[in-house]
Amino acid sequence: MKRLLILAASGIALAATPALAQDFALSGVTLATGDGSEPIENGAVLVRSGKVVYAGPASGMPESPVQLIQVPEDTWVTPGLFATVTTLGLWDVGAVSESNDTRAGDSPFNAALDVSRAINPASQHIKIHRAAGVTRAATVLSTTGSIFGGQGTVIDLGDDADPVTTPRAFQVVHLGENGARLAGGSRVATYAEFANALREARDFANGRWDAESAMLTRADAEALVAVVNGRQKLYVAVERASDIRAVLGLKREYRSLDLVLVGASEGWLVAPEIAAAGVPVIADGLDDLPRSFEELASTQSNVGRMAAAGVKVAINASAMENPRNLNQYAGNLVALTRVPGADGLSWGQAFAAISSVPAEISGLGGRAGTLTPGALGDVVVWDGDPLEVGSVPVAVYIDGVAQPLENHQSRLRDRYRDLDESDLPKAFDW
């Protein structure tokens, strides 16, 4: 019912103007700006020409001729969620290889792979996650033929044909156990391959690359030049504390590397070192089981302890294909603050970890994942506290454009909600 009220009051005509940014305002709502602060009661947000103009207490909103959308009193408004390290847009059915572009294990190229060219904006997974409040995501391959996972891209989940926000936003490298498997069976081989690749990329940049003796393809060497020069972020997938220390040590030899740790299940053990190095972390929200030997020290308090040590931490939703659960993970981290002996996050910290922090790590700091003047008009209207599992989005805007929330799952829900079979197709009549 709330969803119908909001959409009707706003006068949204999606079919008539699917790509036009709308000028609108919401007032009298509980507002979360995504900057780590606590929610604002009786807040307001004003969006014009696809950008946020104002977000704060309703009493301070400037007068404007834009449409004021009427909403129920218990409505919450937040920036769109930012999902990072996902496979959104790269697959339809996991078990159908023709529809699954997440793996490239047989490709002769690795670091040169660019996922931005394969994004399918019509994917049902994009529509489902948009309906869950995710407005932007960083998409990567899950598997390649080497320790390098290729170049990830940042996308928006808007209902249009141009999803790419930032192509080739970052490079991925797998170290630890997974990297050891890909490099020949040992971490020793992993770090040798990694160091050699960086040297060859540096030689390529300096005009000293020898194609005959090089282990990298020319395309891979060229792709890694941006990493060596610090123009492209390097997402390093590691879990074990000793592997994290080894990665941090790389900056002593390659000072230009712009590192991001991904996973870091044992990050809490070396949190002061991570903070001192100024390296951000994308961590699974609630891993607490030793699924492997490199995760023996996993704990649900990992994120909270790293944040307390001064580490910039974004929350990943554990499964790359299900980032729609981000707000649930963030909410559980808030609940952890009430568990004796556990370390969680405040409400503001938890929401920032799924909005502004991943946006900043992905190169969109101040533009996405936040409701501040000048930011992109990615706005989500919720029927309650977004970190409570029972709350759902009732309206989603991306770049100020109202988005459809219908998807394959919602249509199935609506079709079979009623047990009346009178309107079923004749094929169902046995």
What are these regions (language model features)?
Residues V29, T33, E38-G43, E360, ...:
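C-terminal cap of metal-dependent C-N hydrolases
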Residues V93, N100-G105, A111-A112, K233, ...:
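His/Asp/Glu-enriched, well-ordered alpha-helical/loop segment
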Residues H125, R130-L257, V392, D429-W430:
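Polyanionic/metal-chelating signatures
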Residues D35-T78:
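Histidine-rich, glycine-flanked metal-binding segment
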Residues M1-L20:
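Gram-negative bacterial Sec-dependent N-terminal signal peptides
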Residues Y235-E239, L257-E266, P290-S292:
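Catalytic beta/alpha-barrel core
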Residues V29, V45, G50, D74, ...:
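Divalent metal-coordination and catalytic microenvironments
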